Amino acid sequence: MQVLHVCSEMFPLLKTGGLADVIGALPAAQIADGVDVRVLLPGFPDIRRGIPDAHVVSRRDTFAGKISLLFGHYNGVGIYLIDAPHLYERPGSPYHDTNLYAYTDNVLRFALLGWVGCEMACGLDPFWRPDVVHAHDWHAGLAPAYLAARGRPAKSVFTVHNLAYQGMFYAKHMDDIELPWSFFNMHGLEFNGQLSFLKAGLYYADHITAVSPTYAREITEPQFAYGMEGLLRQRHLEGRLSGILNGVDEKIWNPESDLLLASRYTRDTLEEKAENKRQLQIAMGLKVNDKVPLFAVVSRLTNQKGLDLVLEALPGLLEQGGQLALLGAGDPVLQEGFLAAAAEHPGQVGVQIGYHEAFSHRIMGGADVILVPSRFEPCGLTQLYGLKYGTLPLVRRTGGLADTVSDSSLENLADGIASGFVFEDSNAWSLLRAIRRAFVLWSRPSLWRFVQRQAMAMDFSWQVAAKSYRELYYRLK
């Protein structure tokens, strides 16, 4: 079984979001599971620099100009790169310029990605041809459409990491991307009079996956589907929509071997976690105190992530004696709100605006509770890292959060399945009730330690996801 992942980024070569983490870990797990997997990426500068052994496999003159297909390796995974400097050789973000305006030729830049994915199934590399083309998010959404136009030389899977990003372009660009105009209709890639790369993937793929079982159900409902609910409901009824939970890359996120921590630990040596908390309190300007629970946020500061709820609930958290450490950036209003809270409550609230991968490890290793109060969350990785590190997740019941965290209710404690704190409604009062439950559990240290050990024993490794994808590929075959 030969599988080609088609995507726009890959950790640690290039990362703007969770998609990169998935592509950075899943292919290696699949190779270990016996699947011959390779990855196709645009030749963005950071990616090119990370694969110095890449050599030319093929050259083509395409609708987007002359390109070369390169092949190399990264961490044991075969990587194809689309070498097209006129499209990809740009500083900064792969998607927009320094003024945050989307590149005007994105339609060509990412149509080409899908086209090359299809051409791989047609023999672009004469020595390797995929049985399955696995496209990820809107950037690769045209790959299943090109495969359909070419008579489906390979099966296709389209994974939705976040349905909110749709890749919408003017209809006139159908003339530029070498797809038949017959594809531009409601039973195709047309959406609200425009060309939708996301809908192309959803409509033409042989199978759609979402990054958690709950998110796969949610996106058949209007409040989560951004207008795609009719198509997704149909795919669900046809048995062509399923949810496969993302995993944790245990080579990177593992408190037993994490060199970014002041003190490494396991579920049997949790007392070693205390030194990480002390170091984090010092680094964030918090009062050093191991008797109070330290809550943390590592997130983009947006309303989608529920950070406005955290700001609203913060006085209640502080009144109960808790501390907050926040690492993130985003909405200027939220940034100012948290900075003001830090100024008003020195020693109790610490804020770092920005994102630093290394410091996020220190927060995960040192905090007691990680807050993930998202309004929607396709899968979420932060809560998985929290579980792995014995930093109990406090989450809203949505998407992958609902699939991975069990509330520390009396029933769940008795059944030995409690792993964090879960609230239902997207409001500050509901969040505060969950925070109150965290304080109650904190007041019983032996029970807190029991839940930590339960959380750390859970298996969210990529090996589990790799097995599920392998079973899906063979069903399609």
UniProtKB/Swiss-Prot annotation:
Keywords: Glycogen biosynthesis, Glycosyltransferase, Transferase. GO terms for cellular component: cytosol. ADP-alpha-D-glucose binds at K15. It catalyses: [(1->4)-alpha-D-glucosyl](n) + ADP-alpha-D-glucose = [(1->4)-alpha-D-glucosyl](n+1) + ADP + H(+). InterPro entries: Glyco_trans_1, GS/SS, Starch_synth_cat_dom. GO terms for molecular function: alpha-1,4-glucan glucosyltransferase (ADP-glucose donor) activity; alpha-1,4-glucan glucosyltransferase (UDP-glucose donor) activity. It is an enzyme of class 2 (transferase). It comes from the Bacteria. GO terms for biological process: glycogen biosynthetic process. Its EC number is 2.4.1.21. Pathway: Glycan biosynthesis; glycogen biosynthesis. Belongs to the glycosyltransferase 1 family. Bacterial/plant glycogen synthase subfamily. Synthesizes alpha-1,4-glucan chains using ADP-glucose. This is Glycogen synthase. It comes from Salmonella typhimurium (strain LT2 / SGSC1412 / ATCC 700720).
